């Protein structure tokens, strides 16, 4: 393997010739060969967007030669476009400030910008990773800025559209099934009737609440740490740098980014990400509930509830011929569990900052972005391959309604709770219908039973 010599303050080190990274990235590869988790692609893109904005603003403020700034911006555009995916190989499990990943970006952009200016990589390059690409910045403010940019963009462009689409599918099902009377269930036991549409409307409302909660967290994610530099004082950054870079990122992404009002907090803690992930966890809890309900309602086909049918997507067993399983529901419940686990890790990371810097940043953003991707992809998959194909099994629904003892609840206002309970117990013990038990006990007439026990009427009682 051909190499070239790169240098940092620790001295020279050999770097693979074909790669754009430099000395600090190479040292990180050596000292942090830990597991397989790499810095998330959305974070890399966010860091490139930040470096592009910083170069542009530094040039406007007279802090950077315009030609150098232009080359850095062009190099950053290539990274944003996904041209150099193999140049960002560092593990999540590195320094807690993300310094190595900040320098990875600085080195790649410096070497590539040098090439764009007709120069070379390495010692003779025309663009310096620290003096030019990182000008007016510290890893301590760039990394948390990239965290917020990546988190906000991914939530806005992945999670919310997927949530909206699934919500629309379920709302359409709720409207289509609104007149189908079915038996309700509480404590996994029979309860009074409702309609299938009413039941699904509860799922729609859960998703509406989740969307409201997620949107409420975006204002915090839009506040950026850039300009705080090392400890929040803004040392070595132009006084206008923070506001201008934030405005440039807002223009670039379409998100409402602004300079954080207190840079000390922005470097030392991550409440905005904890708050936002809490909303994602709430969405995960709702999705787990919905998916569990769907697979219970579709259980069978002959020995379960069987009130609905869901798409049959693939064989379900390697030994039982013809078996089909609710696999989309299972995938959603698993990913929801992972998001809940991620929330614990993010909470620990967010609570573990000391003095002027939180040093769990890679952990926090790795888990956050994994949750975003899981939820977004999971909702798209569940919507397309399960929810869109939900259909009612009307005969089975009617059968279960007619067999339910809890229809007796409609008699409470007419004969009282105690007599109604006697009817239900007699029917259950002697395997009678409610009507047969009621007439045998003499608590009401056949005409009264027909008038008072109407499942459809019970779904709209006292509304």
From Swiss-Prot:
Enzyme class, broadest EC rank: lyase
Molecular function GO terms recorded: fumarate hydratase activity
Residue pairs linked by disulfide bridges in the UniProt entry: none
Recorded catalytic activity of this chain's protein: (S)-malate = fumarate + H2O
Main location: cytoplasm
Keyword Lyase set for record: yes
Metabolic or biological pathway: Carbohydrate metabolism; tricarboxylic acid cycle; (S)-malate from fumarate: step 1/1
EC number: 4.2.1.2
Active site, UniProt feature: 187, 317
Residue span of region Disordered: 121-142
Binding site residues for substrate: 97-99, 125, 128-131, 138-140, 186, 318, 323-325
GO CC terms: cytoplasm
Keyword Cytoplasm attributed: yes
Residue stretches of biased makeup (Basic and acidic residues): 121-134
Function: Involved in the TCA cycle. Catalyzes the stereospecific interconversion of fumarate to L-malate.
Similarity field: Belongs to the class-II fumarase/aspartase family. Fumarase subfamily.
Cited HAMAP family: FumaraseC
Alphabetized NCBIfam families for the sequence: fumC_II, PRK12273.1
Quaternary organization: Homotetramer.
Listed name of the protein: Fumarate hydratase class II
Designated gene of the protein: fumC
């Amino acid at each position: 393997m051909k190499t070239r010599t790169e240098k940092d303050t620790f001295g020279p080190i050999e770097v693979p010739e074909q790669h754009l990274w430099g000395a600090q990235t190479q040292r990180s590869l050596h000292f942090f060969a830990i597991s397989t988790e790499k810095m998330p692609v959305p974070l890399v893109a966010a860091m490139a967007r930040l470096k592009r904005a910083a170069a542009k603003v530094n040039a406007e403020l007279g802090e950077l030669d315009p030609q150098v700034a232009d080359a850095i911006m062009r190099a950053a555009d290539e990274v944003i476009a996904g041209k150099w995916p193999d140049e960002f190989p560092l593990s999540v499990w590195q320094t807690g400030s993300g310094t190595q990943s900040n320098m990875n970006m600085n080195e790649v952009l410096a070497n590539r910008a040098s090439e764009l200016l007709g120069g070379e990589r390495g010692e003779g390059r025309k663009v310096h990773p620290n003096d030019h690409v990182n000008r007016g910045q510290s890893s301590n403010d760039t990394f948390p800025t990239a965290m917020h940019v990546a988190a906000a963009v991914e939530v806005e462009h992945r999670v919310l559209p997927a949530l909206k689409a699934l919500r629309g599918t379920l709302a359409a099902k709720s409207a289509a099934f609104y007149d189908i009377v079915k038996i309700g269930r509480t404590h996994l036991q029979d309860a009074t009737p409702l309609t299938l549409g009413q039941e699904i409307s509860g799922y729609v409302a859960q998703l509406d609440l989740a969307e409201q909660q997620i949107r409420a967290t975006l204002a915090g994610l839009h506040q950026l740490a850039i300009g705080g530099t090392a400890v929040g004082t803004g040392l070595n950054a132009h006084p206008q740098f923070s506001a201008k870079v934030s405005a440039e990122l807002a223009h670039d992404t379409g998100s409402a980014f602004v300079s954080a009002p207190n840079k000390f907090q922005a470097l030392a803690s991550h409440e905005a990400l904890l708050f936002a992930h809490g909303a994602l966890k709430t969405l995960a809890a709702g999705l787990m509930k919905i998916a569990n309900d769907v697979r219970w309602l579709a259980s069978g086909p002959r020995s379960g509830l069987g009130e609905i049918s869901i798409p049959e997507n693939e064989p379900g067993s390697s030994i039982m011929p013809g078996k089909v399983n609710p696999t989309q529901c299972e995938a959603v419940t698993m990913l929801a569990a992972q998001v809940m686990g991620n929330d614990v890790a993010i909470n620990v990371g967010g609570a573990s900052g000391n003095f002027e810097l939180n040093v769990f940043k890679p952990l926090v953003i790795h888990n956050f972005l994994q949750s975003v991707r899981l939820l977004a992809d999971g909702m798209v998959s569940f919507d397309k391959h399960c929810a869109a194909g939900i259909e009612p099994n009307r005969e089975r629904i009617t059968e279960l309604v007619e067999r339910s003892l809890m229809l007796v609840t409609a008699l409470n206002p007419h004969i009282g709770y105690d007599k109604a309970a006697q009817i239900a117990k007699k029917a259950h013990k002697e395997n009678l219908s409610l009507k047969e038990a009621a007439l045998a006990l003499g608590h009401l007439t056949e005409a009264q039973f027909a008038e008072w026990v109407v499942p459809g009427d019970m779904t709209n009682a006292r509304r």
